[in-house]
């Protein structure tokens, strides 16, 4: 965080220097005064309407020199003032010049007031200084956008001193342009650019139309929060960062504009979210897009404004293609790298040349990548293989979830009431001693005689499997394999199918494919250490070779509650004997040979092999049809390899992986998946849910069942009313109970867990001063909920679109 704070401080300093430089250029243009200084702060012009006098204020400056040759161009004498202010605030009085008055120049000590003449008219902004293209993007949301800046505390609204202003002047004032003469020049230039009368332009501005012209005059990127139309508009006229957020309210037939003062983080989040429309379609949730996008281009040569509204039926796909074909250079927004890459590069001319070369190379690479067609599963695999075209399972880059490292000797005793450290000195000895007392342990229960005190909440995500070591000691033939979510259907955006198992002496490495319908969309590689600690909701496979069966351990009986019970799990998948497993492997090999698929390559299971009549009995549920069902894919392991050696993944000096489970799975984003290989449109309409990838929604009962004491009556909750509402300093929870916002009992409500957290990148607006989880960065309306997320080790909450609790 210190690194980002320094970067923000440096950027803000450069931004202030750029503002002062821009102010000096405008003063030179309007008043004819050339100013040069090593450093200058507080440079501004104020105007007194009573005596028609303007004052040039300088708070502080170093080696400031002013050339008033332009201001006194009617005089024959040229003078240059070496101005070094001695007081905290100094000013130069600018008096309008008349034909019969003479210019008096004097340097007054003390206040350092210099009285000079000034031209009567100020030059307007030239049309040649406007940007080539101005883009206006409108986000229409189904919910109430007007609540975002105020009630939801995403962007803080403060009172404005000029709240009684109306119309276009209010809008310019919200942009920070307060000088009435500059406002008038903007209005005249906007009218000349539109080839329209000034009165018509004023009328349009007062109705809230064509405000992007004023943004073009000011040269700033503005985000408008329109309260009446419930829209969020981004007006982008330069590649610079977003500098202003304006909230618009309609009062009668006029508009009222108020600036939204937000932090740099909120503005950056808001600007980046809006630009994700142009960066790459699948990186922004589809529900944040409107069907209509307005493109506004400023034509310098013809001095007119072209507005075109494009309506898309296929959402972001066509938007993405249209933007790349027209103006790809505007939408190349690098998400990684130096934050200063595209920020104020024109301050340093040498860096500008270097930046343009880098930008040109990035643009070519961007267009080349965009023009290369990819299948969805290839696209997902590329994210896992770091750009490798052909996926190599042994070269995957994993994101490992490890517990916090504790290297203290305080918890190394054999006391049954001790706290269990995650990783550290004496961990194996503690695990072994506790495995011997497995029958006396009751995790999550209150401390009674002969039972262990319930573990702290922060350990419940990792420390639940004490009996596996004991089972391994009783039967050395037991082998465990890690499977995300078991073989449960509709998890991880599709069906989870085991494709490969590599069984070592110390580790089981398993490869799983996730299928959306009949199409492979993702590959996941899991690593399971025998002495590792399991995570709730992620069952193990336990191979008891001696008895010849494949079963789910009974240790999960006390962790599966609610809808996903052990009985339902076992009734769905049953106990698979090795004979049946071998038959499944043989059937699947027949399927591979029918399509000439070699072991180890990516397979397409969209069609079933046409088996002979005598072989139809080997294809489940295919008698008389020859159809290969998607649900049957879960019964076909791809390949099982047993190795009589260690995996070699763990070396001396590294973290003790035998003390923690390596939960390897990349996070799946919620994005639209088009169904391209379906021929029947009616079936496509019936199975529309198959076209969407939904992140795994972890059931609260699988996360912290022992902590969720309150059942909350989740089965009786109406999905439409399943929201958290505020009543003073209390919260009305979805279960109907009223709790204080700072009550610790909030951690015991299962109705809160599935949907309250949201990532900042999923928001179409800024997120200032919202409590965030220190682990995953998810935003919560209350601090206690953010702490709860960190306590339960940041589980994979559902996305914002699937946040409501639905009754089963």
Curated annotation (Swiss-Prot):
Domain of life of the source: Viruses
Gene Ontology CC, one term: viral outer capsid
The main place the protein resides is virion
Subcellular compartments: Virion
- Keyword tags: Capsid protein, Outer capsid protein, Virion
Name of this protein:
Putative minor structural protein VP5
């Amino acid at each position: 965080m210190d690194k980002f704070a320094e970067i923000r401080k440096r950027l803000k300093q450069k931004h202030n220097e750029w503002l002062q430089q821009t102010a000096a250029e405008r003063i030179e243009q309007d008043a004819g005064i050339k100013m040069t200084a090593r450093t200058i702060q507080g440079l501004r012009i104020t105007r007194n309407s009573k005596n028609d006098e303007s004052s040039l204020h300088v708070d502080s400056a170093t080696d400031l020199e002013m050339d008033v040759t332009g201001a006194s161009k009617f005089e024959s004498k040229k003078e240059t003032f070496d101005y070094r202010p001695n007081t905290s605030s100094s000013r130069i009085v600018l008096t309008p010049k008349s034909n019969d008055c003479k210019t008096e120049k004097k340097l007054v000590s003390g206040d350092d007031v210099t009285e000079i003449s000034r031209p009567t008219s100020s030059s307007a902004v030239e049309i040649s200084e406007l940007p080539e293209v101005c883009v206006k993007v409108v986000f229409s949301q189904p919910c109430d956008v007007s609540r975002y800046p105020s009630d939801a505390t995403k962007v803080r609204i403060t009172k404005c001193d000029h709240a009684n202003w109306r119309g276009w002047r209010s809008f310019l004032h919200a942009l920070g342009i307060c000088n009435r003469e500059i406002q008038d020049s903007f209005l005249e230039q906007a009218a000349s650019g539109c080839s329209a009368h000034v009165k018509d332009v004023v009328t349009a501005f007062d109705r809230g139309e064509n405000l992007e012209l004023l943004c073009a005059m000011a040269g700033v990127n503005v985000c408008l929060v329109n309260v009446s139309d419930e829209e969020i508009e981004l007006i982008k006229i330069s590649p610079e960062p977003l500098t202003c957020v304006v909230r618009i309210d309609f009062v009668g037939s006029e508009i009222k504009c108020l600036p939204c003062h937000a932090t740099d983080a909120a503005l950056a989040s808001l600007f980046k979210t809006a630009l994700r429309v142009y960066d790459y379609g699948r990186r922004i949730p589809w529900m944040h897009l409107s069907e209509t996008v307005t493109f506004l281009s400023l034509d310098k040569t013809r001095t007119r404004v072209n507005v075109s509204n494009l309506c898309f039926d296929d959402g972001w796909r066509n938007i993405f293609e249209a933007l790349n074909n027209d103006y790809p250079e505007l939408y190349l927004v690098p998400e990684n790298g130096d934050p200063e890459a595209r920020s104020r590069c024109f301050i340093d001319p040498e860096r500008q040349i270097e930046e343009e070369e880098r930008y040109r190379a990035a643009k070519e690479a961007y267009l080349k990548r965009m023009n290369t067609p990819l299948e969805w599963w290839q696209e997902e695999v590329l994210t896992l293989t770091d750009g490798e075209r052909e996926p190599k399972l042994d070269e995957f880059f994993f994101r490992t979830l490890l517990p916090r490292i504790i290297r203290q000797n305080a918890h190394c005793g054999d006391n049954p009431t001790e706290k269990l450290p995650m990783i550290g000195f004496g961990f194996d000895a503690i695990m072994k001693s506790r495995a011997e007392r497995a029958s006396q342990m009751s995790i999550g229960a209150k401390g009674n005689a002969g039972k262990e005190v319930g573990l702290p909440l922060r350990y419940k995500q990792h420390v639940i499997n004490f009996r596996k070591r004991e089972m391994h000691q009783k039967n050395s033939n037991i082998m465990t394999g890690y499977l995300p979510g078991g073989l449960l259907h509709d998890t991880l955006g599709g069906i989870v199918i085991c494709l490969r198992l590599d069984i070592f002496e110390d580790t089981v490495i398993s490869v799983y494919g996730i299928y959306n319908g009949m199409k492979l969309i993702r590959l996941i590689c899991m690593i399971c250490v025998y002495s590792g600690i399991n995570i709730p909701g992620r069952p193990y496979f336990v191979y008891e070779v001696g008895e010849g069966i494949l079963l789910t351990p009974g240790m999960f009986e006390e962790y599966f509650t609610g809808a996903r019970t052990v009985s339902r799990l076992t009734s769905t998948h049953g106990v698979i004997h090795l004979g049946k497993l071998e038959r499944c492997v043989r059937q699947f090999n027949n399927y591979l040979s029918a399509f000439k698929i070699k072991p180890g390559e990516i397979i397409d299971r969209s069609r079933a092999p046409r088996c002979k009549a005598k072989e139809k009995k080997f294809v489940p549920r295919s008698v008389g049809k020859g159809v290969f069902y998607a649900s049957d894919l879960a019964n076909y392991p791809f390949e099982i390899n047993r190795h009589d050696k260690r995996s070699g993944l763990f070396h001396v000096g590294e973290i003790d992986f035998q003390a923690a489970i390596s939960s390897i799975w990349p996070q799946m984003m919620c994005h639209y998946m088009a169904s391209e290989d379906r021929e029947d449109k009616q079936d496509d309409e019936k199975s529309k849910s198959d076209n969407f990838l939904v992140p795994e929604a972890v059931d609260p009962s699988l996360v912290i069942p022992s902590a969720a004491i309150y059942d909350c009556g989740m089965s009786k909750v109406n999905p439409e009313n399943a929201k958290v509402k505020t009543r003073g300093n209390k919260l009305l929870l979805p279960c109907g109970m009223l709790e204080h916002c700072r009550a610790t009992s909030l951690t015991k409500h299962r109705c809160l867990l599935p949907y309250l957290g949201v990532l900042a990148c999923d928001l179409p607006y800024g997120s200032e001063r919202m409590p965030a989880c220190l682990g995953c960065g998810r935003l919560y309306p209350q601090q206690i909920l953010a702490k709860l997320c960190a306590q339960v080790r940041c589980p994979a909450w559902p996305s914002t679109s699937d946040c409501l609790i639905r009754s089963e």
